[in-house]
Design a protein with these regions (language model features):
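Class I SAM-dependent transferase core
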Residues: 25-72, 80, 110
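Short glycine-dipeptide loop
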Residues: 67-68, 91-92, 163-169
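Class I SAM-dependent methyltransferase SAM/SAH-binding core
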Residues: 72, 77-130
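A short glycine-rich, Lys/Arg-flanked "PGG" loop and its adjoining helix->strand segment in the class I
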Residues: 86, 153-168
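A short acidic, Gly/Pro-enriched loop at the edge of an enzyme's catalytic core
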Residues: 130-140
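A short SAM/SAH-binding and catalytic strip from SAM-dependent methyltransferases
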Residues: 138-152
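Conserved class I S-adenosyl-L-methionine
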Residues: 168-191
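Core SAM-dependent methyltransferase catalytic element
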Residues: 189, 199-220
Length: 220
């Protein structure tokens, strides 16, 4: 009888521990709607005149990207920003072109070869982990991507670990409800700050490209 009671108690403890572990490993549901990550025609990112409308050189200046920098393009899509950043950081720098879409990663690989940009490193991430090397980045940018992230705390924790002290992290996006390919600026700022970042600048010159805000953060 005593042995049976001990076995039941042990079994109960195992069940409780397993349930607790499963809950800990299961991400909480999104606190707001998110947009489905884009998997369509990548050429839509290559609109003529976009470079000028978005003032991408100014964006890179404000992120303090220079020759020799290592920068992550998170949610790189067609590699539109990646190729421009690659030219900025030069042969001694690197651009980590991350995307969760295997077709996009393959597209960027081919594009980098075609444009002779050996400093672009395509990386296949997951929805919750961009697969970045800890303490490796001098800067990072999410261009029209944040509203697609279902679990920001997980992605931001991985990004935070990858950024060097003082490295700048930029988010360019438009105001929306999350499900309409945009997310309210105040929500983005709150989530990023809760993940251990501090906002250091805010700009709206990206409105010319249909994007409402450009936020810059550093990790605390």
């Amino acid at each position: 009888m005593i042995l049976r009671s001990k076995l039941l108690a042990t079994l109960f403890a195992v069940v409780v521990l397993s349930a607790s572990t499963l809950r800990a490993q299961t991400p909480a549901p999104p606190s707001h709607p998110t947009s489905t990550p884009y998997t369509g025609d990548l050429s839509i990112f290559e609109e003529p005149g976009r470079e000028k409308r978005l003032q991408i050189d100014r964006v890179m200046d404000l992120l303090q990207l220079k020759a020799g920098s290592t920068v992550a393009d998170i949610g790189a899509g067609s590699g539109w920003f990646s190729v421009r950043a690659a030219r900025r950081v030069g042969a001694n720098g690197r651009v980590i072109a991350e995307d969760i879409n295997a077709k996009a990663v393959a597209y960027i690989q081919q594009r980098a070869q075609r444009e002779h940009l050996a400093n672009i490193v395509p990386v296949l991430g997951t929805p919750d982990d961009p697969k970045l090397t800890p303490n490796s980045l001098d800067g990072a940018l999410m261009l029209k991507v944040y509203h697609e992230i279902a679990h920001p705390p997980l992605v931001l924790a991985n990004l935070r670990a990858a950024l060097k002290p003082g490295a700048r992290f930029g988010i360019i996006d438009r105001n929306g409800n999350g499900g309409d390919h945009g997310l309210k600026e105040s929500i983005v700022r709150e989530e990023v700050e809760q993940a251990g970042f501090r906002q250091v600048a805010r700009y709206d010159f990206t409105k010319a490209d249909g994007q409402d805000y450009f936020l810059i953060f550093v990790k605390q």
